[in-house]
């Protein structure tokens, strides 16, 4: 199977997923890019676009109108062209898919479906988020504990990581792990879709999941009242487990990027 690589802008992808119609328009434009190296469709009648991209009439008309509205595509005479959807300052990641083929009658046939393109983009947005989170955690640990991957750092190395830390964005709160609520917020998706995607990323080996349990002081005999108080203190995120006679709280799962599998996804 011949594969093709296409770079996407993480910033533009996140922005597009904030509304359903914009996301549909964005994916439509990416499918046009995936259908040919020139990112264009000649003689773009609705029937022709439907045949190339393998989408229905209603979705095709709606996505085309929205793509024109958000300036993801434009007309150049008798040609429909997908605009450049990334800038030099953007954080970019590549997606890989099966190369488009040409039928016997000379027409193009895009070999990546609308749903598959949506999945590929969403996965790279989350992998990029986890990668940045891992980098921040490693940098802070190197500065505060003076070690990296169990090895003691030299004074010069700590200074390098301290300079890196100072270049990172600073917030009042530090969140360890990645909750489903955060994934839902980034991609504006349902809890079911977020959970399914994270499970598939872990199952494929692209992400490694570590479950983190926090020990609580909740007395099992007085669980109800103390549990409500505890949940109120932590912002109602997580759920309780009974482990070895103690009440534990599992909040966000910690994900680690599997560099062995994801190396090809990082822009050079």
What kind of feature is each model-predicted range?
Residues 1-268:
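Electropositive, intrinsically flexible nucleic-acid-contacting patches
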């Amino acid at each position: 199977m011949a594969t093709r690589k296409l770079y996407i802008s993480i910033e533009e992808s996140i922005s597009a997923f904030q509304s359903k119609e914009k996301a549909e328009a964005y994916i439509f434009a990416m499918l046009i890019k995936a259908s040919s190296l020139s990112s264009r469709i000649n003689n773009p009648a609705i029937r022709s676009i439907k045949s190339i991209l393998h989408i229905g009439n209603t979705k095709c008309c709606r996505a085309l109108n929205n793509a024109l509205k958000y300036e993801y595509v434009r007309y150049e005479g008798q040609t429909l062209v997908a605009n450049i959807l990334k800038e030099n300052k953007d954080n970019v990641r590549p997606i890989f898919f099966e190369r488009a083929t040409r039928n016997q009658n000379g027409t193009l046939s895009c070999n990546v479906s609308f749903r598959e393109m949506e999945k590929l983009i969403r996965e790279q947005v989350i992998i990029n988020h986890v990668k940045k989170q891992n980098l921040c955690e490693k940098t802070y640990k190197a500065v505060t504990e003076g070690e990296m991957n169990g090895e003691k750092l030299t004074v010069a190395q700590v200074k390098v990581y301290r300079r890196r830390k100072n270049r990172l964005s600073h917030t009042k709160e530090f969140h360890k792990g990645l909750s489903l609520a955060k994934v839902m917020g980034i991609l504006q998706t349902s809890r079911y879709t977020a959970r399914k995607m994270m499970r598939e990323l872990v199952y494929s080996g692209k992400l490694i999941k570590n479950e983190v349990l926090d020990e609580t002081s909740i007395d099992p005999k007085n669980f109800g009242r103390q549990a409500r108080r505890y949940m109120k203190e932590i912002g109602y995120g997580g759920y309780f487990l009974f482990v070895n006679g103690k009440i534990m709280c599992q909040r966000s799962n910690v994900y680690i990027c599997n560099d062995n599998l994801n190396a090809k996804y990082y822009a050079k």
